[in-house]
Amino acid sequence: YAAWQVSLVVATLMAVTGFVWLKWMISRSLTAGERYDVRDGDPQPKTGGLPHPATGLIPLAAVLGVAFVLHDSLKQSALIVALLAGVLTVLVVNRKYFINLPHAVSNGTLGALIAIANTAAVVGFGAIAKLSPAFGAAVDSLTSLPGDPLVSASIAVTLIAGLTGSASGGQAIALPLLAPHYLGLGVDANALHRVVAIASGGLDSLPHNGYVVTTIRGVCRETHKSAYWPMFCMTVLVPLFGLIVALLLL
């Protein structure tokens, strides 16, 4: 719940900004005569017999509820249990809509393995980069920046997350190095936590990010050249805008 008021404002602002920007990009493309490509192997959409849209909220509520209840006892493992609860809830609520359950499980497992491999490779790269002398020199330079400590902390975390290609990986590497320094300067722990959480979601989704690679190459079967720009706008520019707003509010 650290600085939750700022988090709520920033999250709402980012969601609205991203939605409006994405709608504008789609409208501009349609006006220019662009259309979606149809490829062999694309899933065929169903027009009837779909579950009620409200049932999509039930698994989300299950994830949030289980994570909230088990957070104190299981710590980070609570997220894994919560996601499993969400998957099982989808299965129970929409059981009659599954046509080929083994096929769905097979595709889901394959997608999960690809995502794990991509993310592990990128985070592993970041862990190796952490051991280099240049990384230590970069951290020293970032922590010695003049001005507001929250600003220098946000810059440091953003750049480290960009180097590792992972928000969580960037936090895992940055916090043990940066938190003692900034807390020693008297920075409020709640404000530091919120800034770090938001800052790690900026440059983390550069082209080498595991999620970006999986989404563009694996899921959409596109190239970075044709598909990365909209993703860059939504996952880099919008979060950086949210970070600036958070710093102004804090």
Where are these regions (language model features)?
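Long, contiguous bundles of hydrophobic transmembrane helices that form the permeation core
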Residues: 5-103, 220
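Small-residue-rich segments of transmembrane alpha-helices in multi-pass membrane proteins
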Residues: 40-42, 110-124, 175-186, 235-240
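Core transmembrane alpha-helical segments of multi-pass membrane transporters/permeases
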Residues: 76-84, 88-134, 150, 159
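Short helix-coil transition sites and intra-membrane helix breaks within transmembrane domains
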Residues: 114, 126-132, 161-173, 201-210
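Hydrophobic alpha-helical transmembrane segments
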Residues: 4-8, 53-58, 80-84, 116, ...
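Juxtamembrane and boundary regions of transmembrane helices in multi-pass small-molecule transporters
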Residues: 2-45, 199-250
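Hydrophobic alpha-helical transmembrane segments of multi-pass integral membrane proteins
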Residues: 120-122, 145-187, 196-197
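Hydrophobic alpha-helical transmembrane segments in multi-pass integral membrane proteins
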Residues: 64-68, 117-135, 186-194, 239-249
